[in-house]
């Protein structure tokens, strides 16, 4: 999910796999924006570029990473260098409690370096396209309810700060422009 998202945002050539921990070291890409704020595609070489944003795809953080489980400290050191963080959470039907992933990420970041969670700019609910589809037991109403519950959970987790939740599909590029605009607006503050 994260590597696919990096490819959508920056056209980077990150390895994508259908198994956990495909990414073992950071991958980098550059988002490019035009004068009107739209994100350039790789083909937009002749247009006037106004802003760039470097994006890093980090290896997944697991429970007890802050205690150096796995390659925890090595991965967390990379995250520490980032000025803004986006949590990419599996929001598909096989993950009934996506908010638990947010809690784990917050706990690991905060235990590793207090204040690191203040850099979280948004939560991307990835695989949102899988909810309410024709070959899916979820109905559209179930999907809306799951998203509403998730947004409420995220609000409580980050309170008093507001961290937006944007449902996306990196694979199908659903809401990628919306996410890019939000990140760009955070960089110009």
What spans do the regions from the language model cover?
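Phosphate-binding active sites in nucleotide-utilizing proteins
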Residues: 3, 22-26, 68
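Fold-independent oxyanion-binding glycine-rich loops
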Residues: 8-9, 27, 58-59
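Flexible beta-alpha connector loops of hexameric P-loop NTPases
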Residues: 13-15, 59-68, 92-98, 135-136
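Short beta-strand-centered segment that lines the nucleotide-binding/catalytic pocket of NTP-utilizing
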Residues: 12-32
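Nucleotide phosphate-binding site architecture
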Residues: 22, 62-63, 131
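Conserved C-terminal guanine-recognition region of P-loop GTPase G domains, centered on the G4
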Residues: 31-51, 72-187
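A conserved segment at the C-terminal end of the G1
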Residues: 3-15
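Activation loop entry of protein kinases
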Residues: 54-56
């Amino acid at each position: 999910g994260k590597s696919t998202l990096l490819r959508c945002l920056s056209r980077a050539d990150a390895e994508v796999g259908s198994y956990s921990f495909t990414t073992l070291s950071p991958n980098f890409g550059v988002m490019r924006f035009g004068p009107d704020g739209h994100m350039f595609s790789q083909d937009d070489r002749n247009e006037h570029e106004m802003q760039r944003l470097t994006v890093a795809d980090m290896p997944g953080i697991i429970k007890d990473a802050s205690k150096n489980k796995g390659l925890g400290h090595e991965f967390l050191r990379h995250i520490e260098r980032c000025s803004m963080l986006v949590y990419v959470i599996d929001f598909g039907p096989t993950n009934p409690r996506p908010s638990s992933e947010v809690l784990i990420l917050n706990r690991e970041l905060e235990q590793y370096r207090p204040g690191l969670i203040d850099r979280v700019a948004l939560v991307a609910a990835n695989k949102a396209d899988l909810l309410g589809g024709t070959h899916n037991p979820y109905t559209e109403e179930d999907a809306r309810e799951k998203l509403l519950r998730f947004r409420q959970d995220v609000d409580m987790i980050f309170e008093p700060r507001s961290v937006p939740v944007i449902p996306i599909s990196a694979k199908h590029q659903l809401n990628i422009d919306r996410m890019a605009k939000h990140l760009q607006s955070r960089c110009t503050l």
